[in-house]
UniProtKB/Swiss-Prot annotation:
Biological process annotations from GO: nitrogen fixation; regulation of nitrogen utilization
Pfam families: P-II
Gene: glnBA
Recorded superkingdom: Archaea
Family note: Belongs to the P(II) protein family.
GO cellular component: cytosol
Name the record gives this protein: Nitrogen fixation nifHD1 region GlnB-like protein 1
Lineage: Archaea, Methanobacteriati, Methanobacteriota, Stenosarchaea group, Methanomicrobia
Length: 105
């Protein structure tokens, strides 16, 4: 299993989630977050915004669905401009459903 954390523009979340659903990636957690990338925020004239609002999508997928989920996020979240976001992937050793106690997804 793989955990995918995608930090995307807030305005792209609906499109990204709809595209993921079409690809069969339905289960996810969505959080509103603030952060900055290499550009250290946005600088417009004399005004600086050090942290920008983003949306973080968190999902755990089976190994065979990882590449499809990443491709879907990249294609649906990309504008080609700075601030499109990042995707982080980490292995998940175990997962359990709290209600049933059963392991796995």
């Amino acid at each position: 299993m793989q955990m995918i954390r995608a930090i995307i523009r807030p305005g792209m979340e609906t499109k990204v989630i709809e595209c993921l659903e079409k690809e069969g990636c339905i289960s996810l957690t969505k959080m509103e977050v603030f952060g900055r990338g290499k550009q250290k925020g946005i600088h417009i004239a004399d005004i600086s915004y050090d942290e920008l609002q983003k949306t973080m999508l968190l999902m755990v997928v089976e190994d065979e669905h990882k590449d499809r989920a990443i491709k879907t996020i990249m294609e649906s979240a990309r504008t080609g401009k700075y601030g499109d976001g990042r995707i982080f992937v980490t292995p998940v050793e175990e997962a359990y459903t709290i209600r049933t106690g059963k392991p796995g997804l």
